[in-house]
Amino acid sequence: MKIHLVFVGKTRELYLREGIEDFLGRLRRYVQVEVKTVRSERLTRESQATRVVASESEKVAAAVPRDAHFIVLDRQGKQMSSEGLAHWWQRLEQTGCRKLCFAVGGVLGFSNELRSQAQTLLALSKMTYTHEMSRLILLEQLYRACTIMRGEKYHK
């Protein structure tokens, strides 16, 4: 399995960058991981939020591999437990899926058009997280899913 991660904008907070690197290293023990960061648009007085969302969404769409199962993180998406995520991943593998692509948006999220292109809309929680924090939480949950699938004791 190969995991593609598409992030909008750089992770600015050092503690989050360090956590992301830690969990990328852990996750790479189980699967191939490729991270693509697309440039975020600057939101100024003159710019319109809809233009920013459309532009960032187009960049993300261009970065998604054609043969990947495309997952958009969205607060209206499906919520899963950690075990549920692991079982969902296993079912995809059993159907022949070899690539997953997770997209984490910028501060304004994604366009409805990009959401409609996703095979799965995934919510990390009912709570709201910053887009940068969502990256770290997603990586930890993907790592946790790998340990669950292999019966390892990280998940208690």
Go through each PLM region and give its residues.
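Short glycine-/polar-rich loops that comprise or flank the Walker A/P-loop
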Residues: M1-I3, V31, A68, Q117-Q119
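N-terminal beta1-alpha1 ligand-phosphate binding loop
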Residues: M1-L27
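Conserved RecA-like P-loop NTPase ATPase core
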Residues: L5, I71, G105, L138
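Short hydrophobic segments within beta-strands
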Residues: V6-V8, K36-V38, A103
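Short glycine-rich anion-binding loops that position phosphate/pyrophosphate groups of nucleotides
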Residues: T11, R75-K78, G106-G109
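Conserved strand-to-helix beginnings and helix N-cap segments that scaffold or border functional pockets
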Residues: R17-I20, S82-A86, R115, R135
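S-adenosyl-L-methionine/SAH cofactor-binding core of RNA-modifying enzymes
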Residues: Q32, K36-L100
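Structured adenosyl-cofactor binding patch, chiefly the S-adenosyl-L-methionine
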Residues: L108, N112-K156
